[in-house]
């Protein structure tokens, strides 16, 4: 399935080095201020979802950690609000990519997709439960050293 993906990215993770700055230009990225989420960002996310676009939200609030952290309720909020599924995705091995690239070597990055977790309007009442379910699904797909 070829469909564009919009990624949520923290403003403080916006790369400053020229060789990292190309990614947001080629991929759909919505920058978000972690300290104070702007209404315009929320509206933009709602708009993407209503257009049936794919939105990627890292439930931990970061994509830079090599260990699984506690999930935040952002992805659960949008899934419950729009009654759309959450597709848990486990990504590991990324920490080896840049050092390997510097040595002109290949490395493996593993991406595993889990079964959809169907969110309903009832989940709005208990977002943390939906978040726990999502994080547990991700945890089950990761090797132990990443948990």
Regions found by a protein language model. Give the residues of each.
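Non-catalytic C-terminal accessory region of glycerolipid acyltransferases
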Residues: 40-147
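Catalytic core of membrane glycerolipid acyltransferases/transacylases, capturing the structured
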Residues: 1-36
């Amino acid at each position: 399935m070829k469909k564009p993906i919009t990624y949520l990215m923290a403003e403080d993770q916006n790369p400053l080095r020229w060789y990292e700055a190309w990614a947001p230009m080629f991929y759909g990225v919505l920058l978000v201020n972690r300290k104070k989420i702007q209404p315009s960002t929320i509206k933009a996310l709602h708009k993407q979802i209503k257009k049936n676009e794919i939105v990627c939200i890292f439930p931990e609030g970061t994509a830079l950690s090599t260990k699984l952290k506690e999930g935040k309720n952002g992805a659960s909020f949008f899934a419950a609000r729009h009654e759309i599924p959450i597709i848990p995705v486990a990504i590991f091995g990324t920490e080896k990519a840049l050092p390997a690239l510097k040595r002109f070597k290949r490395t493996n990055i593993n991406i595993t997709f889990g079964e959809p977790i169907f969110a309903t309007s009832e989940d709005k009442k208990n977002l943390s439960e939906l978040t726990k379910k999502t994080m547990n699904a991700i945890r089950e797909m990761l090797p132990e050293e990443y948990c």
